Amino acid sequence: DGVTDPLEVNVVK
């Protein structure tokens, strides 16, 4: 989730 948001992508990691 948060593919459009780079900050959310960091949460996925």
Swiss-Prot record:
Record's keyword terms, sorted: Cell wall, Secreted
One Gene Ontology term, aspect cellular component: extracellular region
Cellular localisation: Secreted, Cell wall
Highest taxon, organism lineage: Eukaryota
Protein name per Swiss-Prot or TrEMBL: Unknown protein 7
Organism listed in the record: Pinus halepensis (Aleppo pine)
